[in-house]
């Protein structure tokens, strides 16, 4: 079971609600994924931005925990304001802190992320910061009291997969809070790899919503999470330089 801030979840897959071709596809993909946690941008909620479509309108929100994110924030102050708006709606106290430092790469601003996380923790939020794969930054965020850390596999929406598995493995090994691999996932193979490294969960959006068949891809991602986690728990065999025969050699006559 995945545990975040005292809450437990059966699924280790967190799913974004944006970018789907239509509401029906979104609804079916969410169902196929088996997720317990849906994430969304506070900026896109109709209740806060009149004239915009509510990305959650087609979903039965009683079945899911919600994880609002502060996408679009460039400063700690903006992120804190968006988080407080989400909580004011009565949805939840859990928030994904996202403070972007570069418009081209969409990589997070480490200083502003730290500032926003610290303020929101003081404010009683369950805080999940989106960050780079920098171990020292991840440790600092954990020390602040963050309830989970969300390092990027690669730039948001790039589909490049896990570019630095060594850096991710350092974070996974040294942190005690859940590590949720976020951003850049492109395929079920990427998901399985993240889980085999020991990640506690993965968060996806573009990899499902922009695929050729989002519903099938959501199911594939669900299975990849389960397979990768089982593989991690089972433990892979040691890598060796040379071959090791898998069949017994006893009883075989030699010329």
Curated annotation (Swiss-Prot):
It is found in: Cytoplasm. 1-deoxy-D-xylulose 5-phosphate binds at residues 157, 183-184, 205-206. It catalyses: [ThiS sulfur-carrier protein]-C-terminal-Gly-aminoethanethioate + 2-iminoacetate + 1-deoxy-D-xylulose 5-phosphate = [ThiS sulfur-carrier protein]-C-terminal Gly-Gly + 2-[(2R,5Z)-2-carboxy-4-methylthiazol-5(2H)-ylidene]ethyl phosphate + 2 H2O + H(+). Disulfide bonds: none annotated. SUPFAM superfamilies: ThiG-like (SSF110399). InterPro entries: Aldolase_TIM (IPR013785), Thiazole_synthase_ThiG (IPR033983), ThiG (IPR008867). Its main location: cytoplasm. GO terms for molecular function: thiazole synthase activity. Transmembrane segments: none annotated. One of its GO terms (biological process) is thiamine diphosphate biosynthetic process. Pathway: Cofactor biosynthesis; thiamine diphosphate biosynthesis. GO terms for cellular component: cytoplasm. Keywords: Cytoplasm, Schiff base, Thiamine biosynthesis, Transferase. The active site is at 96 (schiff-base intermediate with dxp). Its EC number is 2.8.1.10. Catalyzes the rearrangement of 1-deoxy-D-xylulose 5-phosphate (DXP) to produce the thiazole phosphate moiety of thiamine. Sulfur is provided by the thiocarboxylate moiety of the carrier protein ThiS. In vitro, sulfur can be provided by H(2)S. Homotetramer. Forms heterodimers with either ThiH or ThiS. Belongs to the ThiG family. This is Thiazole synthase. It comes from Exiguobacterium sibiricum (strain DSM 17290 / CCUG 55495 / CIP 109462 / JCM 13490 / 255-15). The gene is thiG.
């Amino acid at each position: 079971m995945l545990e975040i801030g005292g809450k437990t979840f059966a699924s280790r897959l967190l799913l974004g609600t944006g970018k789907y071709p239509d509401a029906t596809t979104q609804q079916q993909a969410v169902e196929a994924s088996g997720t317990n946690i849906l994430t969304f941008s506070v900026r896109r909620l109709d209740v806060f931005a009149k004239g915009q479509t509510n990305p959650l309108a087609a979903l039965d929100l009683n079945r899911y925990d919600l994880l609002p994110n502060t996408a679009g924030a460039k400063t700690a102050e903006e992120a804190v304001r968006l988080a407080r708006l989400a909580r004011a709606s009565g949805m939840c106290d859990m928030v994904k802190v996202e403070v972007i430092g570069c418009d081209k790469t969409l990589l997070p601003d480490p200083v502003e992320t730290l500032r926003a996380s610290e303020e929101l923790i003081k404010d009683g939020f369950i805080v999940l910061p989106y960050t780079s794969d920098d171990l020292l930054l991840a440790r600092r965020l954990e020390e602040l009291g963050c309830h989970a850390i969300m390092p990027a596999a690669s730039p948001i929406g790039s589909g490049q997969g896990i570019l630095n598995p060594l850096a991710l493995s350092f974070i996974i090994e040294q942190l005690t809070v859940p590590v949720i691999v976020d951003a850049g996932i492109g395929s079920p193979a990427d998901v399985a790899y993240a889980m085999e490294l020991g990640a506690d969960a993965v968060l996806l959006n573009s990899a499902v919503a922009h695929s050729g068949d989002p519903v099938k891809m959501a199911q594939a991602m669900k299975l990849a999470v389960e397979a990768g986690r089982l593989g991690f728990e089972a433990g892979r065999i040691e890598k060796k330089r040379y071959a090791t025969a898998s069949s017994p050699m006893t009883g075989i006559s030699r010329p």
